[in-house]
C-alpha cells in the first residue's frame, strides 16, 4: 500500500496537470522598453529620446518684428555646424561649494567657442 505522502503528491500533481493555465504572474508595462542603469546606459542601449521632446520646429505664420525672424531661419543651419571649444577660463573668485557634501564647486567661466571646422583640433 502506498504511503499517505505519496498519495498527496500524486493528487497534487494530477491537479496541476488538469488545471487550466492562469494569467501570467508578470506583465510588462506599456511604457518604455528599456531601463537605464548606471553611467554607461546610454552607450550600451543606444540613445533614446523622450516621447515628449519636440521633434521639429513649430510651424506658424507668426513672425516677430526685427531680426528675430532672421535668427529663426538660420537656426537649422546652426545645428549642423561644428562647435569647438577654444578656451575655458574659470573665474576662481566666483566658485562656491555645492551643498552635496562632496568637494564639488560651482564656478562661473568665460568660454570661447568657434563655429569653424578648421579650428577644431583633436
Curated annotation (Swiss-Prot):
CC annotations in GO: extracellular region
Propeptide intervals in chain numbering: 56-122
Coiled-coil region: none
Pfam families per UniProt: NPBW
Signal peptide (from-to): 1-24
Key words, A-Z: Bromination, Cleavage on pair of basic residues, Neuropeptide, Secreted, Signal
GO MF terms held by the record: G protein-coupled receptor binding
InterPro entries per record: Neuropept_B_pre, Neuropept_BW_pre
Similarity comment: family membership: Belongs to the neuropeptide B/W family.
Function: May be involved in the regulation of feeding, neuroendocrine system, memory, learning and in the afferent pain pathway.
Name of the protein in its database record: Neuropeptide B
Organism field: Bos taurus (Bovine)
Gene, per the UniProt record: NPB
